[in-house]
C-alpha cells in the first residue's frame, strides 16, 4: 500500500504550503512511505485528485485544495482530517496502516482491545 499525498508545488498560498509541509514532514519523520503527486505540474494528477475526492468531502464551491491524502486509490482525507488524527494519536488508522509496535498509537489500540 502506498500513501499518496496530492500537493501543489507552486501554490501561492502560504497556508497551503504550510499544511503540505506539515503532512510530508510528519510522514518523513515517522518513516511512513509515501509518494508526492504534484497537481500544479501534472494535469493528470490534478484531474485524478479532483475526480477521486468524495462528493461529501468537497468544498461547497470550487475544487478540493491540497494536501489531499489517499492510500492507493482510497481517499483518506484532507489536512484537517490528518491534523485531527495526529492530535488523537490515530494517524496510522487514518492512513489505513497498521501502527508499528511500540508507537503511541499501537499502545492506545492495545489498551482499547484489552
From Swiss-Prot:
Region of interest (Required for interaction with PFN1, HER2, and ATG12), residue spans: 54-71
Keyword annotations from UniProtKB, A to Z: Cell membrane, Cytoplasm, Membrane, SH3-binding
SUPFAM superfamilies: Thioredoxin-like
Region (Required for interaction with HER2): 13-50
One GO MF term: SH3 domain binding
Function description: Appears to function as an adapter protein that bridges proteins together or proteins with mRNAs. May function as a ubiquitin ligase-substrate adapter. Additionally, associates with translating cytoplasmic ribosomes and may promote the expression of specific mRNAs.
Domain remarks: The SH3-binding motif is buried in the tertiary structure, and it is therefore unclear whether it directly mediates protein-binding.
Annotated disorder: Promotes breast cancer progression by enhancing the interaction between E3 ligase STUB1 and PFN1, thereby promoting proteasomal degradation of PFN1 and subsequent activation of downstream signaling pathways including PI3K/AKT, NF-kB and WNT. Promotes autophagy presumably by stabilizing the ubuiquitin-like protein ATG12. Enhances mRNA translation of E3 ligase STUB1 and the autophagy-related protein PIK3C3. Promotes activation and phosphorylation of ERBB2 at 'Tyr-877' and 'Tyr-1196', and prolongs localization of ERBB2 to the cell membrane.
PANTHER family in alphabetical order: ADAPTER SH3BGRL, SH3 DOMAIN-BINDING GLUTAMIC ACID-RICH-LIKE PROTEIN
Protein name: Adapter SH3BGRL
Amino acid at each position: 500500500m502506498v500513501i499518496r499525498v496530492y500537493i501543489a508545488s507552486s501554490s501561492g498560498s502560504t497556508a497551503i504550503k504550510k499544511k503540505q509541509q506539515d503532512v510530508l514532514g510528519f510522514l518523513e519523520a515517522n518513516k511512513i512511505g509515501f509518494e508526492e503527486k504534484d497537481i500544479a505540474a501534472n494535469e493528470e494528477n490534478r484531474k485524478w485528485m479532483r475526480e477521486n475526492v468524495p462528493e461529501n468531502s468537497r468544498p461547497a464551491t470550487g475544487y478540493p485544495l491540497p494536501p489531499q491524502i489517499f492510500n492507493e486509490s482510497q481517499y483518506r482525507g484532507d489536512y484537517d482530517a490528518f491534523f485531527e488524527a495526529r492530535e488523537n494519536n490515530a494517524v496510522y488508522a487514518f492512513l489505513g496502516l497498521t501502527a508499528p509496535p511500540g508507537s503511541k498509537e499501537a499502545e492506545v489500540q492495545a489498551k482499547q482491545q484489552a
